[in-house]
Amino acid sequence: MTLQRLYRLGEELVANANSRDPFQIADEIGLQIQMVKDFTVLKGVYMILHEVPWAFINDNLDDRMKRIVCAHEIGHHLLHQDLVRQ
């Protein structure tokens, strides 16, 4: 995927959610978010459980990093679901 295509995808997500907040975007695209307090090293994990997409985010991170990790997990959801389903 080209950088231009990634940029367009991001702009489409923002327009559809009417927000740049990755948590609102996740809600708009059906990605469930769960904060996890007992992650020690991991910042976030994306997985599909019973056909429902989930992003688990380390609750010990500061708010800025939580937003970054959420956006990263949205990328997994939109671009790499095929790898998770294997």
Question: Can you describe what each PLM-predicted range is?
Answer:
Residues 1-86:
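Active-site hotspot residues in diverse enzymes, especially metal/ion-binding acidic/histidine motifs
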